[in-house]
A protein has these predicted regions:
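Beta-alpha junction/loop-to-helix N-cap segments that form part of ligand/metal-binding clefts
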Residues: 23-26, 34, 49-55, 67-141, ...
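Venus flytrap/periplasmic-binding-protein-like
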Residues: 82, 129, 136-139, 210-211, ...
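Extracellular/periplasmic Venus flytrap/periplasmic-binding protein
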Residues: 88-91, 136-139, 144-250, 292-295
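Segments of small-molecule ligand-sensing domains
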Residues: 306-309, 313-321, 331-392
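Periplasmic-binding protein-like
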Residues: 96-109, 129-131, 173-178, 226-236, ...
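Extracytoplasmic "Venus flytrap"
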Residues: 27-58, 80-87, 109-110, 177-185, ...
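Short, low-complexity disordered leader/linker segments with a strong preference
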Residues: 1-36, 404-407
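Extracellular/periplasmic periplasmic-binding protein-like sensory domains
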Residues: 198, 246-322, 396-404
């Protein structure tokens, strides 16, 4: 009995020691010298044009490390290529959590991949912060308390365009060309919600694939409808083609361009600035290709950053600027954490941003969160391209209150 008792005691001590080792391993995701951050990006595949987001984030963290890190801790950014494949995203996320032991996941791109990993991260109580997607499912603290978006929602953006059309072009006929994924569907849904009982104003809508070979046919069909307003929701490379095709067909509708492609450098210049003159969009970030910001201190800092930390990057890339601003927001959260870098405190601080202004957001745009509000940026500004620069239309819009009155 005595021997058996000693063996049982030894087993219990060993089990407790293993648990302690496991807890110690968890704590190493943020120790006295390092904070590990996980990320997934489409460095290859159909959405690789957005990979500049991850590259800029990595470069931003390099800059922070050169400046001493955060509270004496260096940032270790572990970013993998998921090729926009949700299955790959889940496998890579498991590895980042279980093998690399990241403190949090940050800024991973795209709706499908982030939806694929959301349950896993919430079950493990791993922060999934500032998701690079405007899907509203990433802003529901009751359902997924460890997941938080960052940018305005796609649906809210669609409602903004619908409200603008009703205010300035009442009763005009509309056509919509939207990307056949969650982004395009959500934005199109927002347009319908904003129009309310006036959805009959939409004569034709066409969903297209990212690698669509029939863009010219689509645009020709939309022109023949006789519509006076053309709304496009898609990636920058496709947007450039569509703007040029519209001009080639001698069609001159009011052209509304989704924010994802609202970039002078990556969309409008390739399309031809003369073809893009008059394009309308809604934005929340400064456009790094816009000469209006040439004397802006924050944009001068951006150019310095690009020269030193991301010299191979395109200084006019709105995707890179997005990554820069998102990384800046995460750094603010980690600074607020002080020496308490538990995952629980990371989420508390992410939900305690008060009128925070990343340096490159448009004037009047602020980041606000609280325990019931997991949508950090809820404001946008309508802008119109005059052939050289974006001109603001009206004041800052609160996207949370953008439903249109039904006429």
């Amino acid at each position: 009995m005595y021997v058996a008792g000693r063996m049982l005691l030894a087993f219990v001590i060993a089990l407790v020691s293993l648990n302690a080792m496991s807890l110690q391993h968890d704590d190493q995701s943020a120790n006295d010298t390092e904070i590990r951050i996980g990320n997934l990006m489409p460095y290859t595949g159909p959405l690789a044009e957005f990979s500049a987001i991850g590259k800029a984030e990595s470069a931003y963290f390099d800059m922070i490390n050169d400046r001493g890190g955060i509270n004496g801790r260096k940032l270790r950014f572990i970013s993998h290529d998921d090729n926009s494949d949700p299955t790959v995203a889940l496998d890579l996320t498991r590895g980042l959590v279980e093998r690399d032991n990241v403190l949090l996941m940050f800024g991973s791109f795209g709706t499908p991949g982030n939806l694929a990993v959301r349950s896993f991260l919430n079950e493990r109580k791993i922060p999934q912060l500032f998701v690079a997607s405007g899907n509203e499912e990433f802003g529901d603290p009751k359902a997924v308390p460890w997941t938080m978006g960052w940018q305005p929602s796609f649906r809210a953006q669609g409602r903004i365009y619908a409200n603008y059309i009703q205010a300035f072009y009442p009763q005009r006929k509309i056509v919509v060309l939207w990307q056949n994924d969650q982004f395009g569907r959500e934005l199109f849904k927002g347009i319908n919600e904003g129009l309310g009982n006036l959805t009959q104003m939409i004569l034709v809508d066409i969903a297209f694939e990212i690698s669509d070979a029939y863009l010219e046919t689509h645009v020709s069909i939309l022109k023949r409808s006789g519509a006076e307003i053309f709304v496009f929701a898609g990636v920058p490379t496709t947007a450039s083609q569509v703007i040029r095709l519209t001009a080639d067909l001698q069609w001159h509708p009011v052209f509304i361009l989704g924010d994802a492609a609202a970039s002078i450098g990556t969309t409008l210049s390739p399309a031809g600035l003369e073809n893009a003159t008059g394009v309308i969009s809604a934005s929340f970030l400064k456009d790094p290709g816009d000469p209006a910001w040439k004397d802006d201190p924050a944009m001068k800092e951006w150019l310095f950053f690009m020269d030193k930390y991301y010299p191979k990057g395109d200084k006019a890339s709105s995707a890179a600027l997005y990554g820069y601003a998102a990384a800046e927001t995460l750094v603010q959260v980690l600074k607020q954490c002080g020496d308490d870098l538990s995952r629980e405190n990371v989420m508390r601080q992410a939900a305690a941003l008060k009128d925070y202004e990343p340096s490159v957001v448009l004037p009047g745009i602020k980041v606000n969160t609280d325990p019931t509000n997991f949508r950090p940026i809820k404001q946008m500004r309508l802008v119109q391209f005059d052939g050289r620069t974006w001109q603001p239309i009206g004041d800052v819009l609160e996207t949370a209150f953008s439903d249109a009155p039904h006429k």
